[in-house]
UniProtKB/Swiss-Prot annotation:
GO (cellular component) term, any one: cytosol
Descriptive protein name: Bifunctional protein FolD
Reaction catalyzed: (6R)-5,10-methylene-5,6,7,8-tetrahydrofolate + NADP(+) = (6R)-5,10-methenyltetrahydrofolate + NADPH; (6R)-5,10-methenyltetrahydrofolate + H2O = (6R)-10-formyltetrahydrofolate + H(+)
Family matches, as PROSITE patterns: THF_DHG_CYH_2 (PS00767)
Any Pfam family matching the protein: THF_DHG_CYH_C
Domain of life, source organism: Bacteria
Enzyme Commission numbers on file: 1.5.1.5, 3.5.4.9
One annotated GO biological process: purine nucleotide biosynthetic process
NADP recorded as keyword: yes
Gene coding for it: folD
Length: 286
């Protein structure tokens, strides 16, 4: 049995087409979804991510505003800019591209964004609502992962999900989202002593650790759904995930590739959150 490849880029395109239709209908009502992205400094990776977000907005018809600051900006000035955007009715979503310079406290910046415009889903209020199963903006990568698993038509309820990784951005929240779908969730991390025993119990295995090709066939139960969140660059320049793709291909039931797996879904769910925010606000742009 060779695993079915879950092509995240194709799933993302399908969802973006749906978002485009929604945006057209909103514009007919005078509502134009708007996203503001704040970029601090000249980090090439951050700039690349921001370009992807701008391109996504253009594709589905979302108004986007890029606000750039030098790396020397003070925390006070950045907070003031967020305050301005919180009060701007044209803007439904605010995203601050991370990481920030060391002299700026990321926690303070994230918490300054209005929860009603927190389309990244990082604000503690958004996280609390997610934990308690309330309607909120879900963090983009975890949300995208759940949507990819749903593409397999697997009934998540009652399944055993094992998450390798416990970051606040992916590992912790993705486990919570699967718990909200009535799955049984196990977390593995650097201190887990019997990891392979646990991962072999997984109907769905999520790998988000940043270690190239760490997960091999002996980690898997036959037929498992494998979602590879890692993006690592080898010395050859080639990208690879945290899963040894070729090694597990004959054991997994479904698997996401790297690239064109989870990555395209992250920006797509950001666009989804921005459109949802515009719907909630119901603001007419003049």
């Amino acid at each position: 049995m060779v695993a079915v490849i879950i092509k995240g880029n194709e799933v993302a395109e399908k969802k973006r087409a749906q978002l485009t239709e929604e945006v057209v209908k909103l514009k007919e009502q005078g509502i134009v979804p708007g996203l503001a992205v704040i970029l601090v400094g000249e980090d090439p990776a951050s700039r690349s991510y921001v370009k992807g977000k701008e391109k996504g907005c253009e594709q589905v018809g979302i108004y986007s505003e890029l606000i750039e600051f030098p790396e020397t900006i003070t925390e006070e000035r950045l907070l003031a800019e967020i305050d301005r955007l919180n009060g701007d009715d044209r803007i439904n979503g605010i995203l601050v591209q991370l990481p920030l310079p060391k002299h700026i406290e990321e926690k303070a910046i994230i918490e300054r964004i209005s929860p009603e415009k927190d389309v990244d889903g990082f604000h503690p209020i958004s996280v609390g609502r997610m934990m308690t199963g309330q309607d909120t903006f879900l963090p983009c990568t975890p949300h995208g992962i759940v949507e990819l698993v749903k593409e397999t038509n697997l009934d998540i309820s009652g399944k055993h999900v094992v998450v390798i990784g416990r970051s606040n951005i992916v590992g912790k929240p993705v486990g919570q989202l699967f718990l909200n779908e009535n799955a049984t969730v196990t977390y593995c991390h650097s201190k887990t002593q019997n990891m392979k025993e646990l991962t072999k119990l997984a109907d769905i295995l999520i790998v988000a650790v940043g270690r190239p090709k760490m997960v091999t066939a002996d980690y898997l139960k036959e037929g498992a759904v494998v979602i590879d969140v890692g993006v690592n660059r080898l010395e050859t320049g080639k990208l690879c995930g945290d899963v040894d793709f070729d090694n597990v291909l004959d054991v997994a039931g479904y698997i996401t590739p790297v690239p064109k797996g989870v990555g395209p879904m992250t920006i797509t769910m950001l666009l989804h959150n921005t459109v949802e925010s515009a719907k909630r606000a119901g603001v007419v742009c003049k």
